[in-house]
């Protein structure tokens, strides 16, 4: 991508969820971030001011709905409304991490489908396009009636491990049945077999038993997941793999939510290295030596340029 992009009608704005990533994306595209400010009234209400003309412009707003989830979501909705009222030609939301994605269906009676509600809010506010990364449930794309580009970080994560030459005895592991498609994509890139962690609870109030489907004895295992939240699943999976004879266990994910006891669990686990992306900004207290962070800015920057130029983005999905 060129160092400078000469279309004054292309604007990129950042809100507060991940300004560092937004700056990287703007640098990848070759433009400066747009000027805006986010302030608060004395009672906590959010006030947004766009400090330059965006009339007739194609605007891209970088905002993950990560912690604080509700604050970041309200910032985004208010920003969309401000852009709409300032006569932006298109309002494109770049949401590296889509919060509330784990509430994508009614698992029990009288539950909301909050992922659909969030989609409705974004559309109603005035967004004209979504660009996002590794949604927890890909079918959330169907909750939107506007175009949505659903990118994934499998290529980025696969390249990281491929460049480390971990040997011929690699196995890519899905920590549950829902992640098999993701694991298979990485396995195809690394030319490795896959294994699956099959979690079962024999009866109520009895601890889950982790069965491993596939051969991991004497193998180097790479666990891939979309989200690591409290890290319970992934650290228990790593322990089960080592007990089954794996020589080393690595882990990676697109979205490092890392809530509650996550850092302690990862530190004490047999995981050699945890590789994450910067879809979520990580404070210093969510950082340990065995972690490494990869940037999704080149991927998102390329997507922005292709969308703006009406070029195909299909190769970015692979």
Swiss-Prot record:
It is an enzyme of class 2 (transferase). Its cofactor is Mg(2+). GO terms for biological process: 5-phosphoribose 1-diphosphate biosynthetic process; purine nucleotide biosynthetic process; ribonucleoside monophosphate biosynthetic process. Mg(2+) 2 binds at residue 176. Its EC number is 2.7.6.1. It catalyses: D-ribose 5-phosphate + ATP = 5-phospho-alpha-D-ribose 1-diphosphate + AMP + H(+). ATP binds at residues 43-45, 102-103. Keywords: ATP-binding, Cytoplasm, Kinase, Magnesium, Metal-binding, Nucleotide biosynthesis, Nucleotide-binding, Transferase. The keyword Cytoplasm applies. It comes from the Bacteria. Involved in the biosynthesis of the central metabolite phospho-alpha-D-ribosyl-1-pyrophosphate (PRPP) via the transfer of pyrophosphoryl group from ATP to 1-hydroxyl of ribose-5-phosphate (Rib-5-P). Homohexamer. This is Ribose-phosphate pyrophosphokinase. The gene is prs.
């Amino acid at each position: 991508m060129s160092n400078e992009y000469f279309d004054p009608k292309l604007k990129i704005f950042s809100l507060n969820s991940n300004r560092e990533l937004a700056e990287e994306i703007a640098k990848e595209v070759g433009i400066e971030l747009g000027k805006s400010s986010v302030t608060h009234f004395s009672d906590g209400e959010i006030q947004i001011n766009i400090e330059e003309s965006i009339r007739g412009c194609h605007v891209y707003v970088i905002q993950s709905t990560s912690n604080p989830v509700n604050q970041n979501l309200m910032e985004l909705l208010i920003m969309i409304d401000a852009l709409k009222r300032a006569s932006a030609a298109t309002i494109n939301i770049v949401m590296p991490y889509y919060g509330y994605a784990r509430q994508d269906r009614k698992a029990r009676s009288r539950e909301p489908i909050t992922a659909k509600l969030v989609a409705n809010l974004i559309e109603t506010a005035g967004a004209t396009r979504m660009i996002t990364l590794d949604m927890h449930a890909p079918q959330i794309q169907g909750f939107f009636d506007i175009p949505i580009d659903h990118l994934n970080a499998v290529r980025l994560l696969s390249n990281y491990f491929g460049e480390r030459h971990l040997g011929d005895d690699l196995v890519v592991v899905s920590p549950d049945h829902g992640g098999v498609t993701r694991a298979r994509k990485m396995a195809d890139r690394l030319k490795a077999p896959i294994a699956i962690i099959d979690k079962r609870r024999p009866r109520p109030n009895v601890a889950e038993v982790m069965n491993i489907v596939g051969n991991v004895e004497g193998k180097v295992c790479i666990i891939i997941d979309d989200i690591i939240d409290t890290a319970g699943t992934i650290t228990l999976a790593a322990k089960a793999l080592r007990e089954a004879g794996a020589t080393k266990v690595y882990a990676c994910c697109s979205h490092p939510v890392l809530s509650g006891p996550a850092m302690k669990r990862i530190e004490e686990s047999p995981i050699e290295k945890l590789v994450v992306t910067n879809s979520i900004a990580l404070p210093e207290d969510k950082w340990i030596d065995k972690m490494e962070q990869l940037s999704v800015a080149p991927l998102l920057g390329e997507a922005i340029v292709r969308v703006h130029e009406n070029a195909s983005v299909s190769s970015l999905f692979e």
